[in-house]
Curated annotation (Swiss-Prot):
This is Threonine--tRNA ligase. It is found in: Cytoplasm. GO terms for biological process: threonyl-tRNA aminoacylation. PANTHER family: THREONINE--TRNA LIGASE, CHLOROPLASTIC_MITOCHONDRIAL 2, THREONINE-TRNA LIGASE. It comes from Desulforapulum autotrophicum (strain ATCC 43914 / DSM 3382 / VKM B-1955 / HRM2) (Desulfobacterium autotrophicum). Homodimer. Catalyzes the attachment of threonine to tRNA(Thr) in a two-step reaction: L-threonine is first activated by ATP to form Thr-AMP and then transferred to the acceptor end of tRNA(Thr). Also edits incorrectly charged L-seryl-tRNA(Thr). Its EC number is 6.1.1.3.
Length: 636
């Protein structure tokens, strides 16, 4: 008799070895139809796996978070089969699940969007056939024989230590895979190819160039339709298009992956940094600055040279090898060591807006979201073990204040100790409990990612949610047990002995360039008044009023309002329309009447028009709105 314990503590008993699907059917046929896989002892398995011992089983249904990833993994196999059916000489490499979908790298002749309908039609046939996904385990030698005509699979197999290799079959199609998979192809209701791009085998430019084919999949066609609508909305908000139209930033081949910020973009940039500095000063941080380029010896000491060398830019100065910093942390360690510290000095909170460079393959670059040079708002907090909880709580409260200023919600994830880590069990327990207790006190729900922490300490990842409901991982709070050890950081305790400080490494904006791009898309270019690159524009109705318009502009600027004047010979209607398209919050029209009375006619983006406003009526509420960094459009 095999006894299966379900999550509600109920027990299902079977005379013979049951499969996962048998357990599901034991609940109900309707429930079984929605089951995708099962979890036993933390491992996800196919539903046709036999259960040979008493155990606890969690059945994964289409409603569970893991289900979509399993579905998309299976969809990648469907896409691969379709491509092979149409292109017999295509050689498959790898096909992982990625955010919002999946891709498969394939050695084949170049394809384009024009080929998608044919491939999608073939995929639809495979889905309609409801082909079961069948797992088999074969020897390494058998696997090499099976895939002997595919050098990429042979290389993958030779790189495996396992002597038993798992493969999956749907009909006549066979692929190398660990699984698990959905029961059959018919469970894929919404399936769509998204785009194609080039890629290199093993991400090595010296190796074969492949075709990377992206797709997405859902359990429901309505979900696919909603997702495609979201994609279209995102295209309208593309920060690259809006940034170009509004004159915020640009990219040039002479510095690939390194953005150029224009005057209007710098107005926004400076506002972001001014706000960051105001909040950090109020929270007890000091601001520091470390060099952009430092000696190889420093990077060897920090561990970056060993683990991150291929992403670093280097140079030789006076016969010594230097590296442009990919991260700010090691410089922060040197700053801490320049002075002796007592427990009375702690916590010490030091922030830096540091310019870092990381080499990215040209194919991976994507606007402001993926660049080679960017600024990171790092801060390092040095503390005693007793201060962990209160400092983490302080960081979370600071995160909430900053993100809320932009109308960004967020959720939290706690990542715990991975298999490979440094530090003792006691250190990890103390660090993890400190994070957990702070999260519990903070009171917002959080997920736990077991084993997903950094090797040097547990962390909290902060995922913001934008206006389209998309999530972005920007902020992170990490407890670092490696760098204080590597740099021999100490403080004198109450016992007059030397102790190792606990260090938090945290970012809130993350890459400021990336955060800038997120804000462009979040607001779709319609920024709140305090952040808008141009806060007001003066439009004279004819050329005779140009001098007066300039006088108005200068007075507004002298009061701290960012203002332009449009002196073109276009119609007033066209100039108003262009100002609205560029989301200028305050559109001021000047006619003879306004000149004579010394007043303004002001139009706001919510469609309201205020006539006959004196400077005394206009400037104070505008400045109050700016200084309060308000989000709403109710300015006057």
């Amino acid at each position: 008799m095999i006894n299966i314990t379900l999550p509600d503590d109920s027990i299902k008993s079977f005379k013979e070895y049951p499969k996962g699907m048998d357990v599901a059917r034991g609940i109900s046929e309707g429930f079984a139809r929605n089951c995708v896989a099962m979890e036993i002892d933390g491992q996800l398995l196919d539903l046709d796996v036999e259960i040979r011992n008493d155990c606890a089983v969690r059945l994964i249904t289409t409603r569970d978070a893991e289900a979509v990833e399993i579905l998309r993994h299976s969809a990648a196999h469907v896409m691969a089969e379709a491509v092979q059916n149409l292109h017999a000489d295509a050689k498959l490499t790898i096909g992982p699940v990625v955010e919002d979908g999946f891709y498969y790298d394939i050695d084949m002749a170049p394809i384009s969007d024009a080929d998608f309908p044919k491939i999608e039609a073939e995929m639809a046939k495979i889905v309609k056939a409801k082909k079961p996904f069948q797992r088999s385990e074969i020897t390494k030698q058998e696997a090499l024989e099976l895939f002997k005509d595919n050098p990429y699979k042979v290389e993958l197999i030779n790189g495996l230590d396992d002597q038993t290799i798992s493969i999956y079959q749907q009909g006549d199609f066979v692929d190398l895979c660990r699984g698990p998979h959905i029961p059959h192809t018919g469970m894929i209701k919404g399936l769509k190819l998204m785009k194609t791009s080039g890629a290199y085998w093993r991400a090595d430019q010296e190796k074969a160039q492949l075709q990377r084919l992206y797709g997405t999949a859902f359990f429901d066609k309505k979900e696919l339709k909603a997702y495609l609508h979201l994609i279209e909305e995102a295209k309208k908000r593309d920060h690259r298009k809006i940034g170009t139209r509004m004159g915020l930033f640009s990219f040039h081949q002479e510095a690939a992956g390194m953005p150029f910020f224009h005057a209007k973009g710098m107005e926004m940039w400076n506002e972001l940094l001014a706000y960051w500095r105001d909040e950090h000063r109020a929270a007890g941080y000091v601001e520091t600055k470390t060099p952009v380029m430092m000696s190889r010896h420093l990077w060897e000491k920090s561990g970056h040279w060993e683990n991150y060398r291929e992403n670093m830019y280097t140079s030789v100065v006076d016969g010594e090898e230097y590296a442009i910093k990919p991260m700010n942390c090691p410089g922060g360690m040197l700053l801490y060591k320049t002075e002796s510290h007592s427990y009375r000095d702690l916590p010490l909170r030091a922030g830096e807006i540091g310019l870092v460079h990381r080499h990215e393959l040209s194919g991976a670059l994507s606007g402001l979201f993926r660049v080679r040079a960017f600024h990171q708002d790092d801060a390092h907090i040095f503390m005693t073990p007793e201060q962990i909880e209160s400092e983490i709580l302080g960081v979370l409260e600071l995160v909430e204040r900053i993100y809320s200023r932009f109308g960004l919600g967020f959720h939290l994830e706690l990542s715990t100790r991975p298999k490979k880590s440094i530090g003792s069990d006691e250190q990890w327990a103390e660090a993890t409990n400190g994070l957990k207790n702070a999260l519990d006190k903070y009171g917002q729900p959080y997920a736990i990612n077991e084993g997903d922490g950094a090797f040097y300490g547990p962390k909290i990842d902060i995922h913001i949610k934008d206006a389209l409901g998309r999530t972005w991982q920007c902020g992170t709070v990490q407890l670092d047990m490696a760098l204080p050890e590597r740099f021999d950081l100490t403080y004198k305790g109450a016992d007059n002995e030397k102790h190792r400080p606990i260090m938090i490494h945290r970012v809130i904006y993350g890459s400021i360039e990336r955060f800038f791009g997120i804000l462009v898309e979040h607001f779709a270019g319609k920024f709140p008044l305090w952040l808008a690159p141009v806060q007001a524009v003066v439009l004279p109705i004819n050329d005779d009023l140009a001098d007066h318009a300039q006088t108005v502009k200068k007075e507004l600027e002298s009061n701290g309002i960012r203002c332009d004047v449009d002196l073109r010979t276009e119609s007033l209607k066209k100039k108003i329309r262009e100002a609205q398209v560029n989301y200028v919050p305050l559109i001021i029209t000047i006619g003879e009447k306004e000149k004579e009375s010394g007043t303004l006619s002001v139009r706001t983006l919510d469609g309201k028009v205020r006539m006959g406003l004196s400077m005394a009526d206009f400037i104070p509420p505008v400045l109050a709105h700016i200084r309060a960094r308000q989000l709403d459009e109710d300015i006057l």
